[in-house]
């Protein structure tokens, strides 16, 4: 199992209120070849959430948008909220492990830009709300 599912009850609603199931996920880091993870993400719909919240890092490859939308297909029929993480904007890039031993000059090397606009459109077209600012 690539992803860990934790169930937590948070007693916030007044007594007698209908229970609300919220599914939160983050850091999917999907690529088109991650078949096991795609299947696992599809299984999240069986949890029957009332609301889905994603806090980013959907992508890990420039060709991942269709993969992400396919993996989330059933969840996209449920009300959802999302923000992007840094990995939704730029591909991961190799980082020299010796950089920790060098002086930090404040510059950051970013990977190639990812098609986050396509992901944004795909999620919003299915009714999810973009909470990025």
PLM regions: where:
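Histidine-centered divalent metal-coordination motifs
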Residues: 29-31, 87
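Core catalytic region of metal-dependent phosphoesterases/phosphodiesterases
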Residues: 36-133
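N-terminal membrane-anchoring alpha-helices
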Residues: 1-16
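Active-site-proximal beta-strand elements of phosphoester/diester hydrolases
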Residues: 19-29
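General small-molecule cofactor/ligand-binding pocket signal
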Residues: 11, 23, 129-131
């Amino acid at each position: 199992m690539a992803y860990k599912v934790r169930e937590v009850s948070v007693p916030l609603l007044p007594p007698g209120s209908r229970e609300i199931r919220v599914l939160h996920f983050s850091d999917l880091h999907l690529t088109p070849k991650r078949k096991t993870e795609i299947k696992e993400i599809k299984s999240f719909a069986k949890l029957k959430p009332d609301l889905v919240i994603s806090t980013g890092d959907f992508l890990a490859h420039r060709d991942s948008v269709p993969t992400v939308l396919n993996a989330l297909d059933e969840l996209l029929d449920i009300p959802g909220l999302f923000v992007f993480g840094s990995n939704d904007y730029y591909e991961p890039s190799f980082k020299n492990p010796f950089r920790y031993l060098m002086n930090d000059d404040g510059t950051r090397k970013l990977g190639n830009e990812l098609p986050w606009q396509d992901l944004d459109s795909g999620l919003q077209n299915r009714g999810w709300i973009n909470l990025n600012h």
